[in-house]
């Protein structure tokens, strides 16, 4: 079951932040900084709950198993509304049961319901498992962000 997250889910959501750096990170990025930045961003959105942010929790066997954070924003290039998958994580205990896939299907349905013209996400190059999942669901490079540590 996928449901809208409530403030009672905040600690669970924040408890999955470490998942976003459990793979090789690009040069110049370290786990501590990445985790801290993502935690700050999630805390901000969870605290303020802006109208453009939507959090969902997936439940399996009565237990919270993962979450997804969607943001509705204007597409810079074609002025249409897009839905950005800002965060998507499944707990280690629930990996391999198709929950990430179910969250992706839910994100697409949500985006269509809200009249979005595009569904986007960002992923670190080293997160190969997620990249394979996203490719299976039709995600392909839209705009590459390149970086150079200074």
Protein language model regions, located:
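Conserved beta-strand-loop-alpha-helix junction that forms the acyl-donor binding cleft
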Residues: 95, 117-130, 147-150
């Amino acid at each position: 079951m996928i449901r809208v997250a409530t403030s009672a889910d905040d600690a669970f959501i924040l408890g999955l932040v470490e998942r976003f750096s459990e793979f090789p990170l690009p040069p110049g990025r370290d786990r501590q900084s990445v985790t801290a930045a993502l935690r700050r961003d999630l805390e901000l959105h969870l605290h303020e709950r802006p109208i453009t942010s939507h959090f969902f929790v997936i439940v399996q066997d009565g237990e919270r198993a993962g979450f997804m954070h969607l943001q509705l924003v204007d597409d810079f290039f074609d002025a249409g509304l897009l839905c950005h998958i800002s965060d998507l994580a499944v707990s280690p205990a629930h990996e391999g049961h198709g929950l990430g896939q179910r969250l992706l299907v839910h994100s697409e349905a949500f985006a269509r319901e809200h009249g979005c013209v595009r569904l986007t996400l960002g992923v670190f190059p080293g997160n190969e498992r997620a990249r394979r999942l996203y490719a299976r669901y039709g995600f392909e490079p839209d705009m590459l962000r390149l970086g150079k540590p200074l």
